[in-house]
Amino acid sequence: MRYRGASGDVLALQDISLSVRKGEFAAVVGPSGCGKSTLMRLVTGLHRPTAGTVSIEGKEVTGPVKIAGMAFQHANLLPWRKVIDNLLLPLEIVQPHRSQFRTKKKEFRARAEALLETVGLKGFGDRYPWELSGGMQQRVSLCRSLIHEPELLMLDEPFAALDAFTREELWCVLRDLWQKLRFTVILVTHDLREAVFLADNIYVMSARPGRIVQVKPVDFPRPRSLEVTYDKAFADIVHELRAKIAQVRIS
């Protein structure tokens, strides 16, 4: 996968092969600039591969994937819209929900309120984003990415800008949402503890041009509590991943 940068063509990904089963929670880690975010844009159809194919449920991806939801490092909520209206925005602009929005608005609003309750924000629908903390805004962002009931959730470092305590709190929020709704997740993160706590499998990428150089299964029983992060076995996996990433950074 190449793209045009300021100084010419950049080879971001090369000979990359990644297979994620339906319902899996996958995490992608690797050194900065290895192509993790490029991989995410390929999977969601925002970029077309210059070689090879991307397929979801056996169908080649040729454009933006409607069954996918996305959340990023910054919540990017519209400050002039109330929380409930920020949640409903994807349903207002994406088909087939757009054509149904007027007739199903009551149903869609109930869905949004149910999501807010699930993430501990019951009663906050009529607030504006600037009235919420950073952690609360990220909860709203997660809800917005799930409002159209996607089968695939793509997360690009969604908790990176938060403090450690809020970050761990939102790990548990995401864990509970995934266990309740059972969508497929691909999480791009630099936080190795986050990856080990949340994922079924961790895909380690090389330095650019990015390739998958290791797939690390995580076998801790579910549901996982934060107590598992203090186990020696947990720390051992984190150290193994850190050593692998250090190795590929200089290779």
Give the label of every model feature segment.
Residues M1-R182, I186-D191, L198:
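ABC family nucleotide-binding domain
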Residues A207-E240:
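Conserved beta-strand-loop-alpha-helix hinge in the C-terminal portion
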Residues A161-A164, V238-S251:
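Extended, non-globular alpha-helical segments
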Residues Y3, G123, P150, S206, ...:
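A general structural signal marking secondary-structure boundaries and capping sites
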Residues I56, V204-M205:
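Short hydrophobic beta-strand elements within the C-terminal catalytic ATPase subdomain
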Residues F197-V204:
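Conserved catalytic segment of ABC-fold P-loop ATPases
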